[in-house]
C-alpha cells in the first residue's frame, strides 16, 4: 500500500513514545503517510507474571506460553500496553485506534511446530481490509501481536514477526523495527546496511547474536516480501541499520 509506514514499538513501548517520536509521526501525516504500529510488551508481561507468581520460561527467544501465561499476555497487551499507547496519541489530538486478533479475526495464526512452546503461533494471514479502511481515513492503527487460529485459540506471536507480516501484507513502503540499540553493531560500530544474504554469514561470525537473530530473520522476510525499506533502530530520527533484499558483493 503506497505511502504506508509500519512501526514496531520496542518491548518497553513507553520508551519509544518520546516527543521526537510524535513529531516524526506528525511530519509523516503531513506528508500523507499512513501509519500502522505493532507493539510488543514483553517487559510488562514478565513484570505481571512475577507479581502473580507465575514462572517465566523462554525457549529460543520465545516465551513459553501455557494457559495462565496466555491469559496474562492478553490482559497486559490489550488491557495495559495498547491503551497506554493510544492514550498518548489522543493527548496529542492524533486520531488512533487499537486493534487485536479478536477484531474481525484481524490476524489469523497457527501453532508453531514446537509443542513445548504452548500457545505460541505464527501469522498465516493478515486481513488488510479493516486496516486499509482505517488508514484511508487517516486513523493510526495500533495492533497487538496476538493471533487466532481456525479453532479460535488465541496465540502469542513474536511482535517483530507480527510487524513484518503486517508490513508485507500491506506492501508498506517502510518498516521500522524499534529496539533498545541504535542498529546492528559490529564491535562498537553500527552497520549501516546489510543485504539479506549476508545475515547468515554475520551470524556464523558471531556479529549477530541473541535477540538480534530472530529480529534480523523477520526483517529479511519483510525485505524479501515487498516492503520498500526495512530499518532496525532505536529511534525514528536515526538511520540505524537498513536491511536490503539484494545479493551482497564480495
Curated annotation (Swiss-Prot):
This protein's name: Acetylglutamate kinase
Keyword Translocase: no
Organism for this UniProt entry: Listeria monocytogenes serotype 4b (strain F2365)
Pfam hit, one: AA_kinase
Localization, UniProt: Cytoplasm
UniProtKB keywords: Amino-acid biosynthesis, Arginine biosynthesis, ATP-binding, Cytoplasm, Kinase, Nucleotide-binding, Transferase
EC id: 2.7.2.8
SUPFAM superfamilies the record matches: Carbamate kinase-like
Amino acid at each position: 500500500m503506497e505511502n504506508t509506514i509500519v512501526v514496531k514499538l520496542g518491548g518497553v513501548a513507553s520508551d519509544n513514545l518520546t516527543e521526537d517520536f510524535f513529531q516524526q509521526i506528525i511530519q509523516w501525516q503531513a506528508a500523507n503517510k499512513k501509519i500502522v504500529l505493532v507493539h510488543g510488551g514483553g517487559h510488562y508481561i514478565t513484570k505481571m507474571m512475577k507479581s502473580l507468581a507465575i514462572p517465566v520460561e523462554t525457549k529460543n527467544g520465545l516465551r513459553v506460553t501455557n494457559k495462565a501465561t496466555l491469559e496474562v499476555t492478553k490482559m497486559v497487551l490489550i488491557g495495559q500496553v495498547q491503551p497506554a499507547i493510544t492514550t498518548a496519541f489522543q493527548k496529542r489530538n492524533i486520531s488512533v485506534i487499537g486493534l487485536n486478533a479478536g477484531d474481525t479475526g484481524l490476524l489469523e495464526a497457527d501453532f508453531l511446530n514446537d509443542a513445548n512452546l504452548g500457545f505460541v503461533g505464527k501469522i498465516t494471514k493478515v486481513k488488510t481490509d479493516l486496516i486499509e479502511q482505517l488508514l484511508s481515513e487517516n486513523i493510526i492503527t495500533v495492533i497487538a501481536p496476538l493471533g487466532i487460529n481456525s479453532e479460535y485459540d488465541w496465540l502469542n506471536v513474536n511482535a517483530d514477526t507480527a510487524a513484518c507480516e503486517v508490513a508485507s501484507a500491506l506492501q508498506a513502503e517502510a518498516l521500522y523495527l524499534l529496539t533498545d540499540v541504535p542498529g546492528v553493531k559490529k564491535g562498537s560500530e553500527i552497520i549501516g546496511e546489510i543485504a539479506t544474504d549476508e545475515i547468515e554469514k554475520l551470524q556464523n561470525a558471531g556479529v549477530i547474536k541473541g535477540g538480534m537473530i530472530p529480529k534480523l530473520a523477520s526483517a529479511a522476510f519483510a525485505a524479501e516480501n515487498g516492503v520498500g525499506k526495512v530499518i532496525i533502530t532505536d529511534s525514528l530520527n536515526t538511520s540505524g541499520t537498513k536491511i536490503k533484499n539484494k545479493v551482497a558483493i564480495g
